[in-house]
Amino acid sequence: MTFKFVDLFAGIGGFHAALGAMGGHCVYASEIDKDAARVYQRNWGLKPDGDITLAANDVTMDVPPHDVLVGGFPCQPFSKSGKQMGMEETRGTLFWNIAKIVEVHKPQIVLLENVQNIVGPRHIHEWQVIIHTLRQLGYRVSEKPLVVSPHLIRPEFGGRPQVRNRVFIAATLIPKGKRDINADVDVPNLESVMMGWDPQKWNLEKDLPLDKLKSKSEKSAVALNETEISWIEAWNEFVEIMRERLGENNLPGFPIWADDWVHTKDLNISYDTPDWKANFLRKNAEFYTAHKTVLDRWLKKWNHLQDFPPSRRKLEWQAQNEKNLWSTVMHFRPSGIRAKRATYLPALVAITQTSIVGKQKRRISTREASRLQGLPDWFDFVDQSDSLTYKQLGNGVNVGAVYNVIRAQVIRDLDLLGEESALVKSILGAPSNPDLVLGAHSKFHELAQEQARKDEEEYLPLRIVK
């Protein structure tokens, strides 16, 4: 049993990995970034189309028929005409092109992914229009957002030690005889793959896992430079001093701003200072006043941190009772050096804030970052730079999250899809963990590429002319 899917805004293929592991084969992919498209083609044997606005519009429909449509689309503002919300209100945005494909082909399942801001106050209008449009097109979809992060999914179901909260829009075609486009429904239920799991049980070193790098080239690619090491050494000494001084008590949870350390009697906060900042300034003054002698000694040793850039004269301690800085996972952020326990990592992002593994005194490698997204170790990033690979991974979707969301969507909508359909049998008949399929490199890889070649030979684009 198998099904056909299209992969829009495909990136390097996180959606493809998840749906391919469920037995699906991709009949069309679209990715405008040439570097990401090259990685996609290398791994999946299918060359993505470029600009989706040229492939799906009022005149042309180059996207072939399919059962499932997936995509991590950009969130763009819609017009606010004051009229009835609907598909026309989305015209000029990439969601309109998605809706056009859905209108023409009526795939049984539509699964879209976006950042959490799409359900925030700034985008409430866009969210409402998206839900309304999908319902007008004949789909069951919840107006409540489904927010999923891989670190909340049990490892045996494809979870990963990465906080990556993403919103999924799970829409299922309603057969005409059952159609009630205004009926609300709950979001797909992922409780069975999250139940009983404590994210604090993640062990980054074992569960990712972290590699033991051997070659000089591997080590140099992720090594910290001397300046970065000096920043960490200075703040590590601070942590150890305060650990000895505070005993069993944790270090302060508020941001430590060394530039703003003054005695409480000398504290002067201007009237226009935001409340949150004034609060931190007061707490830093109280902290400095309570520990002035040891802090002055530490500052003197490190030249009052004058050799450090302003953002490195700040520490955000979120590592609870860890003994020192080198036992944590760190990030160099504009707001300071952030330290967390080595359980799970913050979200990979498309900018250079790569996680630093304190125990190994290095950044995570591109292969380790790839594992965070659920991609298998055979995944090939061709000959591109590491910075480009980190960027692509930061823009990507987590395989395990997609895999479990679409399975939960099918279970929620069995009454619409039918238990005997090939789509349902393929998805529900797949292993509970995508790693079990993706790990079998040769068989999975060869089947995916063989199917892509067949589809390319057989498919002739459908042209719509008005």
What are these regions (language model features)?
Residues 1-4, 40, 52-91:
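Mobile, glycine- and charge-enriched loop segments
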Residues 2, 25-26, 66, 107:
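Local beta-strand N-terminus motif with an aromatic residue
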Residues 6-54:
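SAM cofactor-binding core of SAM-dependent methyltransferases
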Residues 26, 48-50, 140-146, 420-421:
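A short coil-to-beta-strand element that immediately follows conserved catalytic motifs
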Residues 58-66, 81-329:
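Class I S-adenosyl-L-methionine
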Residues 240-466:
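C-terminal target-recognition/interaction regions appended to catalytic cores
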